[in-house]
């Protein structure tokens, strides 16, 4: 199991290209839907113009950010109609709490559920999983991310809307291309483990 000092390390470790497979359970309909996507994660330093811009967008002092990520995705879901697409991109900026680098605010230029700027709360739990809570106008999304091994990241999410749980999702994300930063981190953490192997 990977160990992280803070969320910045977690996102740096996530840098690279991922292939995601997921199953979403639509609880009111008692039906499940499968899907997949390709995800690209790029690490951004705190002085990156995109990080500064998103902090300004949220009226936050950019000097408080430790950096973040630029994420792009393209995918499909089983119930998609012809005119639906699941492509997009977003910038994450991390603002850790002053007294605890393992928790803080995660700023986005757009959310997944609503295409508006959104701020979530994050923390690393006792197993070094990243827990993210994001509140939108009509719903709250709870997510947990963790690494089963350096090339396999798992994610669960629950959407709560109008006082009840609407959907739950389980994702298995397999790394198909790493970044130099991630490869170095993996070699230091697991010197006998091949980053490209199982």
Curated annotation (Swiss-Prot):
Gene3D superfamilies: 2.40.128.20
Complex formation: Forms a heterodimer with CpcU.
Record family assignment: Belongs to the CpcS/CpeS biliprotein lyase family.
CDD domains: lipocalin_CpcS-CpeS
Phenotype upon loss of function: Cells are a yellow color, 70% reduction in phycobiliproteins, grow slowly, have an increased sensitivity to high light and a long lag phase. The C-phycocyanin beta subunit (PhcB) in this strain is missing the phycocyanobilin chromophore on 'Cys-82'.
EC number from the UniProt entry: 4.-.-.-
Function field: Attaches a phycocyanobilin (PCB) chromophore to 'Cys-82' of the C-phycocyanain beta subunit (PhcB) and the unique PCB that is attached to allophycocyanin alpha and beta subunits (ApcA and ApcB). In vitro, and probably also in vivo, chromophorylates ApcD and ApcF.
GO biological process: protein-phycocyanobilin linkage
Organism of this sequence: Picosynechococcus sp. (strain ATCC 27264 / PCC 7002 / PR-6)
Swiss-Prot/TrEMBL keywords: Lyase
Name of the protein in its database record: Phycocyanobilin lyase subunit CpcS
Keyword DNA repair in annotation: no
Top-level taxon of origin: Bacteria
Pfam families: CpeS
């Amino acid at each position: 199991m990977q160990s992280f000092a803070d969320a910045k390390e977690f996102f740096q470790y996530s840098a690279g290209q991922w292939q995601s497979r997921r199953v979403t359970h639509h609880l009111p309909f008692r039906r499940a839907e499968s899907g997949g996507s390709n995800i690209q994660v790029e690490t951004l330093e705190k002085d990156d113009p995109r990080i500064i811009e998103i902090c300004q967008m949220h009226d936050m002092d950019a000097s408080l950010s430790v950096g973040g990520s630029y994420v792009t995705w393209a995918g499909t879901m089983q119930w998609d109609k012809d005119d639906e697409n699941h492509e997009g991109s977003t910038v994450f900026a991390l603002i850790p709490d002053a007294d605890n680098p393992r928790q803080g605010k995660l700023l986005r230029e757009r959310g997944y559920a609503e295409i508006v700027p959104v701020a979530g709360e994050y923390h690393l739990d006792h197993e070094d999983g990243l827990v993210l809570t994001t509140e939108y106008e009509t719903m709250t999304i709870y997510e947990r991310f963790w690494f089963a091994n350096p090339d396999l990241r798992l994610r669960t999410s629950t959407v709560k809307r109008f006082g009840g749980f609407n959907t739950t999702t389980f994702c298995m994300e397999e790394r198909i291309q790493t970044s130099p930063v991630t490869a170095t981190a993996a070699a230091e953490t697991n010197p006998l483990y091949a980053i490209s192997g199982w």
